[in-house]
Design a protein with these regions (language model features):
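Outer-membrane beta-barrel proteins
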Residues: 1-211
Length: 211
């Protein structure tokens, strides 16, 4: 699943310039994690985004082994002259085939100020005919030197938490990243010799390009 980032344009109490922008992205990760949950041991992805006057819509797809995940999202974002940003959106996560996962639909709220970012998402999973509700809270610190740290917490009918520490930079217009993820046993696919769930730790490397 694609992590929906804060999209911020224009400003409160200021005139907004009529601008439109289309961008594309491709990427590859050594291990595809989303909100602390392993999706696939290496995955390629691609996406397209359209933004105009604070409104955004986009699509993103990734290889998940047993088919393709494709996400569609839309919303509206603002940023004030004081540096506060906010966005409100909707995301649907879909999968080809019927073996990897089922449909997820959620609303997303993102807030940001300085190095601080907050995500709150509330959604429903079809879960192969057994509908369930979930929510997610993510707290992120992002620094100008490329370092970041995230703490994520699953709630409602889901459970678990994870912590991610990473670094991202751009070299010759290529985006490079590395992160370490620590996930609780509720989110882990790891088991011990007795078959009990273990906490999960992973080193993830990424490379990408935006156009």
């Amino acid at each position: 699943m694609l992590t929906v980032l804060v999209v911020a344009f224009g400003g409160l109490g200021t005139a907004q310039v009529a601008t439109a922008d289309v961008s594309y992205n491709v990427g590859y990760v050594s291990e595809y994690y989303f909100r602390g949950i392993l999706q696939k041991n290496s995955s390629a992805s691609a996406g397209i985004d359209y933004e105009e006057n604070g409104f955004y819509i986009g699509a993103w797809g990734a290889d998940v082994g047993d088919g393709i995940e494709y996400d569609i999202y839309l919303g509206y974002g603002i940023e004030t002259e004081a540096g506060f940003s906010a966005s409100l959106g909707y995301t649907t996560y879909q999968y080809t085939g019927d073996t990897f996962d089922d449909e997820y639909n959620e609303g997303n709220l993102n807030l940001g100020y300085g190095i601080f970012g907050l995500e709150y998402s509330k959604g429903t999973c079809e879960c192969f005919g057994a509908e369930s509700d979930y929510d997610f809270i993510g707290l992120t610190l992002s620094f100008d030197n490329g370092l970041y740290a995230t703490a994520g917490f699953h709630g409602d009918e889901s459970d678990g938490e994870y912590f991610e520490f990473g670094y991202g930079t751009t070299v010759a217009e290529i985006d490079l990243g590395a992160s370490i993820i620590f996930a609780s046993d509720e989110l882990s696919g790891e088991v011990d010799s007795d078959g009990n769930a273990n906490e999960d730790t992973a080193l993830v490397l990424s490379i990408g390009k935006s156009f």
